[in-house]
Amino acid sequence: MSISILRLCLLPMILIPTSALAAEPADAKRLDRLPTLFIIGDSTVRNSTKGQVGWGDPIGDLFDKSTIRVINRALGGRSSRTYLTEGLWEKVLADLQAGDFVIMQFGHNDGGGLSDPRGRASIKGTGDETQEATNARTGEKETVHSYGWYLRRYAGDAKAKGATAIICSPIPRNIWKEGKVARASNDYGKWAGESAKSAGAFFVDLNEIIAKRYEDVGQKKVADEYFGATDHTHTTLAGAQLNAGCVVEGLRGLKDCPLAGYLKP
């Protein structure tokens, strides 16, 4: 065999490992990034309306940003159902890596009828039952699941990718009765806790933690500083900061939750 022919035979053997190595730096860069906390939820977590702020924005300042990234992927008007059906969760999953974290808080937009024009209600509870409904927004048939099913789906998907899932009960509204904040302990707060337990996820009872904090502060201050004059659901910056602090309080109280190790002292 001539030297020229021998060189042609060896060329593919040389090129294949070289081209494979060329792709490694991009993959390595992706794998070597800081652990990331992804936050998903509704407008009480992230809000673009003037004067309204969700807790998912100020909470980033409570983490050591030299050790973790905090990305708020919550979106106003979304429910546990529509965060999945609109493809928002799929985008989070595409970026999620082993060692990352997901905090989720849904519930405020999950009520109503399944064929409501906004197409966002889930079945009440945590069961596995389904119901066929026509999505009034898209005009398409849709299999609707329970609130708890959607939370378990998010937690299960996150865990399958090696990430840690934390489920929060929804923040309380500025609604009081006989000097006490109205809780969600008989519906979405309860169901969030049950879903976390069955999914093997961590649970922060944010509804209860914040309600107690509001009661300590007092109804007048809560109304004057933490909410808008005509809105009992969405918080001001001060309210969002207080709620973010309550999320951190809940994280610190969890046993063996690795996310707490990334908080500022």
Show which residues each predicted segment covers.
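N-terminal secretory signal peptides that target proteins for export/translocation
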Residues: 1-4
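Bacterial N-terminal signal peptides
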Residues: 7-18
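Flexible loop/turn segments at secondary-structure boundaries
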Residues: 20-23, 174-175
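Serine-esterase "nucleophile elbow" of acetyl-processing enzymes
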Residues: 23-75, 90-102, 120-126
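Alpha-helical cap/lid subdomain in secreted, periplasmic
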Residues: 31, 88-235, 241, 245-264
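Residues at alpha-helix caps and immediate loop-helix transition turns in enzyme cores, especially N-
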Residues: 51, 84-85, 239
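Histidine-bearing beta->alpha loop at or near hydrolase active sites
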Residues: 77, 236
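Structural motif
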Residues: 79-88
